[in-house]
């Protein structure tokens, strides 16, 4: 009787483990067996090859933004890939970086306007905005 119980228990454990590993494999490899890093290949996303092909065949006579594939007059006009959740912060050397917008009660609303959000400096090193990026670039800290 004990042997049958142990056999049944080991069978159940084996099946549960197989299902768990299959679930984890789909989560971390995008379900396509190709190491997608958690990205699912659905209608809205492109494979790296499709992205490269679209970039190479883009009809742009000025500047093609590498992150978004949008045609603009100059690199400084490239938008961030996720403008609703990112700030475009200009560096002193003319380049820019996209960072996550600050979040929190009473803070996030200040950063909603893309025409002015890069100008805001909370003057607080605990709030990661464009002012913080520029201080980090210059290796400065706020004096307390």
From Swiss-Prot:
Residues 1-18 form the signal peptide. Keywords: Signal. The keyword Signal applies. CDD domains: LCL2-like. InterPro entries: LCL2. The keyword Signal applies. One of its GO terms (biological process) is ERAD pathway. It comes from the Eukaryota. Probable component of the endoplasmic reticulum-associated degradation (ERAD) pathway. Belongs to the LCL2 family. This is Long chronological lifespan protein 2. It comes from Lodderomyces elongisporus (strain ATCC 11503 / CBS 2605 / JCM 1781 / NBRC 1676 / NRRL YB-4239). The lineage of its organism: Eukaryota, Fungi, Dikarya, Ascomycota, Saccharomycotina. The gene is LCL2.
């Amino acid at each position: 009787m004990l042997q049958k119980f142990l056999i049944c228990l080991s069978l159940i454990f084996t099946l549960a483990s197989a299902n768990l590993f299959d679930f984890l494999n789909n989560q971390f490899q995008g379900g396509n067996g190709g190491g997608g890093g958690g990205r699912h290949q659905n209608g809205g996303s492109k494979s790296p090859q499709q992205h490269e092909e679209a970039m190479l065949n883009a009809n742009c006579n000025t500047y093609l933004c590498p992150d978004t594939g949008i045609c603009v007059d100059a690199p400084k006009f490239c938008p961030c890939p996720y403008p609703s959740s990112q700030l475009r912060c200009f560096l002193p050397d003319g380049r820019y970086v996209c960072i996550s917008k600050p979040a929190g009660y009473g803070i996030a609303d200040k950063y909603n306007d893309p025409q002015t959000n890069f100008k805001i400096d909370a003057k607080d090193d605990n709030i990661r905005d464009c002012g913080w990026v520029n201080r980090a670039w210059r290796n400065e800290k706020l004096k307390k």
